[in-house]
Amino acid sequence: MSDSQREQRKNEHVEIAMSQKDALVSDFDKVRFVHHSIPSIDVSQVDMTSHTTKFDLAYPIYINAMTGGSDWTKQINEKLAIVARETGIAMAVGSTHAALRNPNMIETFSIVRKTNPKGTIFSNVGADVPVDKALQAVELLDAQALQIHVNSPQELVMPEGNREFASWMSNIESIVKRVDVPVIIKEVGFGMSKETLQALYDIGVNYVDVSGRGGTNFVDIENERRSNKDMNYLSQWGQSTVESLLESTEFQDRLNIFASGGLRTPLDAVKCLALGAKAIGMSRPFLNQVEQSGITNTVDYVESFIQHMKKIMTMLDAPNIERLRQADIVMSPELISWINQRGLHLNRK
């Protein structure tokens, strides 16, 4: 594939992603908090700091991996970097493969660090990238962490996608051993199982983003790019974010669990934290906001989102993220069935 074709693909991904709509039915609606009438804390007492093994986040919310690799996506990355800088949230860039292949594309990613020199930034590569390229991806952004995206369904639906996955796990292990910053294994909207989490833990992974079904749908995106659009039947493939968090329960004391995929509201975000996530990522909401409403309105959106999360945590009598795990929750019969059929053991504190 030529560089111009790759650039076109990057733009197509963004265009199709922006046109996607939120799911009408979400597993977040199948999780409910029990309301207790009299909190013992004030909103001002809520501390939203997220403590992970290797770094802390001022807020448990970050702009998740989206884009880079074309002139248009450079502009998007710059806008999002301003939003991250002004609000104090972390930001991940999209796959840096374009920049690792073509030096002319480096600035479409490095603009993020240039715009936000003191911010927390995650770089991003695929699971098949050589170790030396993974090191370059970190250096490119002076990144605090490296996301490795695992996206086999997307690759298999993508007309020009990868068809070879046998080396992914061993390659991830090599990168984890060589890269000095934390490595976050990131799904792209298909969720993770307890078996995947066990396998990743066994090779030394400390961070995962379970990124479940319900948000940006890369099967649909790649199917739109197919000449006969013949793989739409896979559009609901994978686990939802809620199901993935339930799958992660027994690993939450051993792994730093991040969650993304289909979050619509501050309430959805708080539910993720209550189910064991240490931070939550969002992509399309930020993309749509910054492209349709501009930087200032997106900053306002983020600040409002954070304040709403604080208010919900106050209602739940949770002065910090750790205490959220003690919040009383009721789940739907469908989720209880998932728990039982999968043999999951919920050790909510």
From Swiss-Prot:
Record-listed E.C. numbers: 5.3.3.2
Q: Which UniProt keywords apply?
A: Cytoplasm, Flavoprotein, FMN, Isomerase, Isoprene biosynthesis, Magnesium, Metal-binding, NADP
What is one cellular component GO term in this UniProt entry? cytoplasm
- Cell compartments where the protein resides: Cytoplasm
One GO BP: isoprenoid biosynthetic process
For this protein, the record's Pfam families field holds: FMN_dh (PF01070)
Protein's UniProt keywords contain Ligase = no
Query: Which positions are annotated as binding substrate?
Result: R9, K10, S95, T96, H97, Q154
Any single GO molecular-function term of the entry would be: oxidoreductase activity
Q: How does it assemble?
A: Homooctamer. Dimer of tetramers.
Query: So what family is this one in?
Result: Belongs to the IPP isomerase type 2 family.
Matching HAMAP family, A to Z? Answer: Idi_2
Write the protein's name: Isopentenyl-diphosphate delta-isomerase
| Phylogenetic classification of the source organism | Bacteria, Bacillati, Bacillota, Bacilli, Bacillales
